């Protein structure tokens, strides 16, 4: 077995960009969100393409009905009807071969794994969810299933950066009070938020030491979807799964 082959790694984590799909403007082209007004057939084609690329059946990639909550849902199987898991912003599983997907266009996608315990999670950490503890709650749920913070690896995807995510000062201070380290100053000199910075501090305080982050800013990087930059637009995905044992 080639230990350097990514197909042999104990956990797989991927992020998509806006390239490589069939959706038309303003969703061009690899939009994976079925709730943004895109042609459903185009979204289905893109989702099938993603599943094919990562080597899984489309019905083994589980999406969420994301509502900017702090609700965490443990699943043992994909919904029988192929629909998204209702009203949740984090999925946790111990099932091999079941991929968990999070959709974003500025919010922070967080992929978590403890391969020793065989527990993974995908988290949609938007401003409100992050403020209200969605990541901490997900880690706690993983611990209930045998994970340990010291063994958890966290990967945060591209998201709105503090340099560009401008918000009213009262909003920033409200988030800072619940998620210390998130208040920022934009390149314009105005008050902003850096949710990834706040989540980094929070995860470190919880004992998670292995943390990586895609540094790209969705607002400024045109290879990525951004609601802040574009308004009506698509969604990219973060996906995590435990491969089935050979």
From Swiss-Prot:
- The EC number of this protein is 2.4.2.1, 3.5.4.4, 2.4.2.28
Q: Sorted alphabetically, which CDD domains does this protein's record hold?
A: YfiH
Query: What's the catalysed reaction?
Result: adenosine + phosphate = alpha-D-ribose 1-phosphate + adenine; S-methyl-5'-thioadenosine + phosphate = 5-(methylsulfanyl)-alpha-D-ribose 1-phosphate + adenine; inosine + phosphate = alpha-D-ribose 1-phosphate + hypoxanthine; adenosine + H2O + H(+) = inosine + NH4(+)
Q: Does the keyword Zinc apply?
A: yes
| Binding residues for Zn(2+) | 68, 107, 124
InterPro entries associated with the record: Cu_polyphenol_OxRdtase, Cu_polyphenol_OxRdtase_sf, Cytotoxic_necrot_fac-like_cat
Required co-factor(s) are: Cu(2+); Zn(2+)
Q: Which GO terms describe its molecular function?
A: adenosine deaminase activity; copper ion binding; oxidoreductase activity; S-methyl-5-thioadenosine phosphorylase activity
Transferase is among the record's keywords: yes
Q: How does it assemble?
A: Homodimer.
Q: What does this protein do?
A: Purine nucleoside enzyme that catalyzes the phosphorolysis of adenosine and inosine nucleosides, yielding D-ribose 1-phosphate and the respective free bases, adenine and hypoxanthine. Also catalyzes the phosphorolysis of S-methyl-5'-thioadenosine into adenine and S-methyl-5-thio-alpha-D-ribose 1-phosphate. Also has adenosine deaminase activity.
Say which family it is in. Answer: Belongs to the purine nucleoside phosphorylase YfiH/LACC1 family.
Q: What protein am I looking at?
A: Purine nucleoside phosphorylase Cgl2154/cg2365
């Amino acid at each position: 077995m080639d230990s350097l082959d990514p197909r042999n790694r104990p956990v797989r984590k991927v992020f998509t960009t806006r390239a490589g799909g069939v959706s038309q403007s303003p969703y061009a082209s690899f939009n994976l969100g079925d709730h943004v007004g895109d042609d459903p057939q185009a979204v289905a084609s893109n989702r099938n393409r993603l599943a094919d690329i990562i080597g899984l059946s489309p019905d083994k990639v589980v999406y969420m009905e994301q509502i900017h909550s702090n609700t965490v849902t443990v699943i043992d199987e994909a919904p029988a009807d192929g629909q998204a898991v209702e009203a949740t912003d984090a999925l946790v599983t111990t099932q091999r071969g079941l991929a968990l997907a999070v959709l974003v266009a500025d919010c922070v996608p967080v992929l978590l794994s403890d391969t020793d315990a065989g527990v993974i999670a995908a988290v949609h950490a938007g401003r409100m969810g992050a403020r209200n503890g969605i990541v901490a709650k997900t880690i706690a749920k993983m611990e209930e299933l045998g994970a340990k913070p010291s063994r958890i690896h966290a990967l945060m995807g591209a998201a709105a950066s503090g340099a560009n995510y401008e918000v009213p000062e009262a909003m920033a201070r409200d988030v800072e009070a619940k998620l210390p380290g998130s208040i920022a100053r934009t390149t314009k000199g105005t008050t902003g938020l850096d949710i990834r910075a706040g989540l980094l501090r929070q995860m470190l305080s919880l004992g998670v030491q292995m943390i990586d982050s895609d540094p790209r800013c969705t607002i400024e990087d045109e290879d990525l979807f951004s609601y802040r930059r574009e308004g009506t637009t698509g969604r990219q995905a973060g996906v995590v799964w435990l491969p089935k044992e050979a």
